[in-house]
């Protein structure tokens, strides 16, 4: 099974004719999502990737029948109106993709959703993907990538970071651990389905046997999970990694919802609460796959499958010459470079064949430091690759990768 969406979910796309709406509709359809209709006022009668477009949600429901879910790809100031329209037409699950939706708008959406029994994910979310069934949003970037990176298995994944959502799932799969559903809860201060609500949904899913999550400083989502475990409402094994260990009080970390205020929402406090509740918390992001495998094994859960190794690739090398006891990297003597240049300078040299200027070297160093706590993210790497293949400079490719985090 899965949570929230599956291959039978009838999906409506609000804002389907916009740039994001068109691109993400293609991803959703190619992955297998049952996208039934789209809505953009004034665009009725047009077709986007085979999906009929209507002027309103009510019109789409009248022509195509009841909808189960709506993916909202419209500017933040219009999100409230779109969400209220969707709920008025009987839609019971909404994915609110845009960030910076006004807080009071989100509060109103929350109130109406509670009254009508509607769930919504976001705002500021990458989306949700039920492996080999359906995707809403933009997880994976393309259907081809999503099908390659994410394989079925017994682990549910939820995260407060969009990039980490994909990264955790990708790295787990490299260890042979597949997923049921992958979800990014959203990065804003007020969201519809925080981590604690997602964990409760996974608890009720018979095919999800364990949960892996990425938490952050700020708010109380992680502490509320600890309380759920202590109350006996959550019993499945949970493995967690929390970002923001070095953040100081009063500073925002990564997302609008990640801010430490005094002693509230600190990294230390969250880790302590989770560990006291029995959650396995790892302190190094790269340890997640192995630790998850160990936790599953201790619970008697067989979660691993054979990982297919790619064959036949030919890898280029930056080594330009080999002599007895000496290797040349891009024409430079490697032993003379060691201890004299930084890691970022070495990367630039290997990729470009020349040493970076002082300005570019410092820029790359800053980018690497800023990325350490979040780890490498496949979507960011894909963005950098796409820009690089156009012939753009290495600096431009790096910038594209960072901007996609």
Could you tell me what each predicted segment is?
Residues 1-308:
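Catalytic-core regions of core metabolic enzymes
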Residues 304-405:
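Hydrophobic alpha-helical bundle cores within soluble ligand-binding/oligomerization subdomains
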């Amino acid at each position: 099974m899965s949570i929230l969406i599956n291959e039978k979910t009838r999906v409506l796309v609000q804002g389907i004719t916009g740039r994001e709406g068109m691109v993400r509709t293609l991803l959703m359809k190619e992955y297998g999502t049952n996208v039934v209709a789209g809505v953009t006022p004034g665009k009725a009668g047009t077709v986007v990737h085979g999906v009929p477009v209507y002027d309103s949600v009510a019109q789409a429901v009248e022509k195509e029948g009841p909808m189960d879910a709506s993916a909202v790809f419209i500017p933040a100031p219009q999100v409230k109106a779109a969400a209220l329209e969707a709920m008025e037409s009987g839609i019971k699950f909404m994915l609110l993709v845009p960030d910076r939706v006004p807080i009071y708008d989100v509060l109103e959406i929350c109130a109406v959703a509670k009254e009508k029994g509607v769930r919504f994910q976001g705002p500021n979310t990458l989306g949700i993907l039920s492996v080999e069934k359906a995707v809403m949003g933009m997880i994976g970037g393309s259907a081809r990538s999503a099908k390659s990176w994410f394989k079925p298995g017994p682990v549910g994944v939820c995260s407060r970071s969009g990039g980490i959502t994909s990264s955790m799932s990708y790295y787990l799969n490299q260890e042979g651990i597949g997923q049921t559903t992958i979800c990014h809860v959203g990065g804003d201060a007020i969201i519809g389905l925080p981590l604690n609500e997602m964990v409760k949904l996974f608890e009720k899913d018979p095919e999800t046997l364990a949960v892996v999550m990425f938490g952050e400083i700020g708010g109380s989502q992680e502490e509320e999970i600890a309380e759920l475990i202590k109350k006996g409402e959550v019993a499945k094994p949970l493995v967690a990694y929390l970002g923001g260990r070095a953040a100081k009080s009063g500073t925002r970390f990564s997302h609008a919802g990640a801010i430490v205020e005094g002693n509230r929402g600190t990294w230390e406090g969250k880790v302590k609460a989770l560990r006291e509740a029995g959650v396995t918390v790892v302190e190094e992001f790269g340890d997640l796959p192995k630790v998850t495998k160990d936790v599953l094994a201790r619970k008697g859960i067989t979660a691993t499958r054979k990982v297919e190794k790619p064959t036949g690739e030919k890898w280029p090398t930056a080594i330009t010459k080999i002599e007895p006891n000496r290797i040349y990297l891009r024409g430079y003597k490697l032993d003379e470079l060691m201890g004299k240049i930084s890691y970022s300078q070495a990367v630039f040299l290997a990729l470009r064949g020349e040493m970076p200027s002082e300005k570019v070297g410092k820029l790359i160093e800053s980018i690497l430091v800023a990325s350490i706590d979040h780890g490498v993210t496949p979507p960011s790497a894909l963005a950098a690759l796409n820009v690089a293949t156009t012939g753009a400079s290495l600096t431009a490719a790096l910038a594209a990768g960072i901007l996609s985090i």
